[in-house]
Amino acid sequence: MPVIGTFCVSVDKDVCVNAQSPGKCATCVEVCPYGVYEIDAQGQVHVNNYNTCVGCRICAEFCPANAIRINPAESEYLSRYPWTFGQIEEIHHKSLTGGYLLRGFGTAGPLPHFDGIVVVPSQLASESPRDKYREECQMEVVIGEDTAEEPITLRYPILFPAMSYGALSREAKLALAIGAAKTGIATNTGEGGVVPEEPYYANGYADPERKEQKWAPGGYLVIQWSTGRWGVSADYVNAGDAVEIKIGQGAKPGMGGHLLGAKVTEEIAAVRGIPVGSDALSPCRYYDVLSFEDMKKMVAFLRDVTDYKKPILMKLGPSRPYDDVRMAAEAGVDAISIDGICGGTGASPDVVTQGVGIPTIACIPPAVRALKDLGLHRKVKLIALGGIRNGLDAFKALAM
């Protein structure tokens, strides 16, 4: 793919009609208004002048074999902003279908993130470690030590966030459970119900009788309680080691969950309690929670259902971190997860994922301040979610 001008022009010779039969097709030559293509004496089409390509993609639209690709040689934000290809394609999609773009994953584009933060090291003014090998570091985190009979102790201050069965395959869910068991951390069911093997896999056992631990030291399973109540029962709530109340998430704050019907197989339908092939749509809020007092009652209800044995967590999206975290803490939960705009999802309107919420790094300081103002920052644990990609991101989040 030669790159000379602002745009890269590539032709897939394996599918190009002209490449297979010279002289048979020259649509790109005919429709390009800028002379990018030419046809030689043998009837073969070639890219003649890359510099004249303006990225209109008329050639790609008219190519009968869909063999042409036009991509920016530099960021679209420099070459085409604000009318990027993505913006144009979205307008076409809305015009043709009358609907919005629905996609997975998370936000894309230049948002403030952990890359813009650096770590200040120790030197003369503060004590430095002996070296990275011998310095002792206490990383255990206990959740629910003051309120639950069976608090959970994470070996490291990280966990796998909620990703539901359906958005992820059965194999992926069990792989996360085994990973949690091997590292001594927690994994989360998400709002789609629990895979039958998930609870004992997360605890490190390969069989439901839990006779012999296979994956040491063993981890934990957090059961998510969401607005859709998918697969919810007393047995479900007690299947794990902690319960998380889902209020929102980073990739689609202000909205409920959405699992596309194409992903709802017989097995997933059985777990969620819905018809095969139907979209699973969770409400944006709890219809039985109409006030702050109702929220406190929900926390108390879950403590009662779990016989006061399990910690209760709450997951928030990126809205008003200070006020939201303060209310969650006052409702009596043991830990609060706050998910920034860089978090992921299985399905969400593109316009919401791209344009609603606040960055993860902007969620953490006001959330910490809310707990400190209540005098609960040593009691209620704060969990930062959303685009934490590696150990350095995790370290920066902890430092904040």
Model regions: which residues?
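Hydrophobic, small-residue-rich alpha-helical packing segments that form membrane-like cores
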Residues: 231, 239, 244, 249-285, ...
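Conserved, well-structured core domains of diverse proteins
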Residues: 1-3, 65-158, 162-254, 260-261
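Iron-sulfur cluster-binding cysteine motifs and their immediate structural context
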Residues: 23-46, 58-76
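Glycine-rich phosphate/ribose-binding loops and adjacent secondary-structure elements
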Residues: 61, 283-400
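Cysteine-cluster motifs in flexible loop/terminal segments that predominantly coordinate metals
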Residues: 13, 19-28, 56-59, 376-377
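N-terminal cysteine/histidine-rich coordination modules
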Residues: 2-15, 34-36, 42-45
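Glycine-rich, proline-tolerant flexible connector loops at the mouths of alpha/beta enzymes
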Residues: 44-47, 192, 196-201, 252-256, ...
